C-alpha cells in the first residue's frame, strides 16, 4: 500500500512538471503571472501585505526582522488573503489552456 501513495505522488509531480513545461513553452505562464499581478493589485491584496509587513517591523523592530523572517511570517497569511474570485479565475484559465492543448 505504501507504494501506491509514493507512485501517485511521483505521477502527480510528473504531471505538474509537464503542465508547467507547456505553460512556459507557450508563454502562457507569463500571461497568467501578469494577470495574477493585476488582479492582486486591483483587489488591494498588495496593500494589505505591505501593511502586514509594516506591522511586523513595528512590533519587532527593524533590527530584529530580516526579509526571510517577513516572507516566512507573511506567506501563509498572504495565501489566505488571495480572493476566491482570483483563484477561480486563474484556475479556469489553466483549465481552458489544458483543454486547448488536449485538442491540439
From Swiss-Prot:
GO annotations of cellular component type: DUBm complex; nuclear pore; nucleoplasm; SAGA complex; transcription export complex 2
Keyword Transport (UniProt): yes
Gene3D superfamilies: 1.10.246.140
Region entry Disordered, spans: 1-22
Pfam families according to UniProt: EnY2 (PF10163)
Top-rank taxon, per record: Eukaryota
Cell location: Nucleus, Nucleoplasm
A Gene Ontology biological process term: transcription elongation by RNA polymerase II
Ranges of biased composition (kind: Basic and acidic residues): 1-14
Main location (coarse class): nucleus
Keyword Protein transport: yes
Keywords: Activator, Chromatin regulator, mRNA transport, Nucleus, Protein transport, Transcription, Transcription regulation, Translocation, Transport
GO molecular function, one term: transcription coactivator activity
InterPro entries: TF_ENY2 (IPR018783), TF_EnY2_sf (IPR038212)
Family: Belongs to the ENY2 family.
Function: Involved in mRNA export coupled transcription activation by association with both the TREX-2 and the SAGA complexes. The transcription regulatory histone acetylation (HAT) complex SAGA is a multiprotein complex that activates transcription by remodeling chromatin and mediating histone acetylation and deubiquitination. Within the SAGA complex, participates in a subcomplex that specifically deubiquitinates histones. The SAGA complex is recruited to specific gene promoters by activators, where it is required for transcription.
Subunit structure: Component of the nuclear pore complex (NPC)-associated TREX-2 complex (transcription and export complex 2). Component of the SAGA transcription coactivator-HAT complex. Within the SAGA complex, participates in a subcomplex of SAGA called the DUB module (deubiquitination module).
Identification of the protein by name: Transcription and mRNA export factor ENY2
Lineage, top ranks: Eukaryota, Metazoa, Chordata, Tunicata, Ascidiacea
Underlying gene: ENY2
Amino acid at each position: 500500500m505504501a507504494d501506491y501513495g509514493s507512485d501517485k505522488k511521483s505521477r502527480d509531480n510528473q504531471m505538474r512538471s509537464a503542465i508547467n513545461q507547456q505553460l512556459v513553452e507557450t508563454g502562457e505562464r507569463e500571461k497568467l503571472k501578469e494577470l495574477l499581478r493585476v488582479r492582486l493589485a486591483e483587489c488591494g491584496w498588495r496593500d494589505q501585505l505591505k501593511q502586514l509587513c509594516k506591522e511586523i517591523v513595528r512590533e519587532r523592530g527593524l533590527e530584529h526582522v530580516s526579509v526571510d523572517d517577513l516572507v516566512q511570517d507573511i506567506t501563509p497569511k498572504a495565501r489566505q488573503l488571495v480572493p476566491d474570485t482570483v483563484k477561480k479565475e486563474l484556475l479556469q484559465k489553466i483549465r481552458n489552456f489544458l483543454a486547448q492543448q488536449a485538442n491540439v
